[in-house]
Swiss-Prot record:
Family as reported in the entry's similarity comment: Belongs to the class-II aminoacyl-tRNA synthetase family.
Origin species: Clostridioides difficile (strain 630)
Cited SUPFAM superfamilies: Class II aaRS and biotin synthetases (SSF55681)
Enzyme nomenclature, EC number: 6.1.1.14
GO CC field: cytosol
Gene3D superfamilies: Bira Bifunctional Protein, Domain 2, Class II aaRS and biotin synthetases, domain 2
Highest rank taxon of the organism: Bacteria
NCBIfam families: glyQ (TIGR00388), PRK09348.1 (NF006827)
GO-annotated biological processes: glycyl-tRNA aminoacylation
Subunit structure: Tetramer of two alpha and two beta subunits.
Compartments (UniProt record): Cytoplasm
The protein's name in its UniProt record: Glycine--tRNA ligase alpha subunit
Pfam families in the cross-refs: tRNA-synt_2e
Primary location: cytoplasm
Amino acid sequence: MNFQEMILALQKYWSKQGCIMMQPYDIEKGAGTMNPNTFLRSLGPEPWQVCYVEPSRRPADGRYGENPNRLYQHHQFQVILKPSPDNIQELYLESLKEIGIDPSEHDIRFVEDNWEAATVGAWGLGWEVWLDGMEITQFTYFQQVGNIECELETGEITYGLERLAMYIQEVDSVYDLKWNDKITYGEVFNKAEYENSMYAFELCDADMLFNLFDIYEKEALRLMENGLVIPSYDYVLKCSHAFNTLDARGAIGVSQRASFIGRVRNMAKTVAETFVKQREEMGFPLLKDGDK
């Protein structure tokens, strides 16, 4: 099974479970959790089921395209089930069968590992899923998002697509993966990995990025004053990526780091609070009448 066949199989499986199938969000982010289909929709009492692939940029993890399993940009397959069903683990194990992994033939373990994303004020209780000794998935039950308590238990399943594919295709380097039957992962992404690593570690202009952070922050706050949740959140994501790039460059000191994280978190909280307030004013339209 090549990389894109694996994605298609997961999309088909989870759409059959009632998930709407979305596309990646078109702004840089470090994880699928930061996509508004998770970050915002996890809040409030309305049900939400969604799945999507999310290219996730983590500048500090870049290795110039030379490391077989550390990447500037990797791909996550994100599933959100709100409310979380009682059989969520069984649903997950069934999904593995769809990509050729029979749980009865492998050592699959759920290892306790609570999760936190400080920049967006989110945390949850959860587990890493280990397949024959390799982490392939993160399970999380959100407790807070945007520093707001989650009203309805939300289950998040985040598959690490590259790791899963390396296991399925039995290769030791991500760059040897078959993207389809003709093109390898390396042919698609190796040059971008080198160039993005060169940029993050050596060539990015720190002064410019500090300035951009201030501009993005100012614009996010201005838009929130006008009640524009989505455009404001876009600028929160831009702030987060600018911060991550500065952090990878080594341009942010220890005391500065806490300050920048706090600034992003405060913006994210304001966006989250406004989103919930607006949904409430709309009468939480996704709720059935009996649940309101």
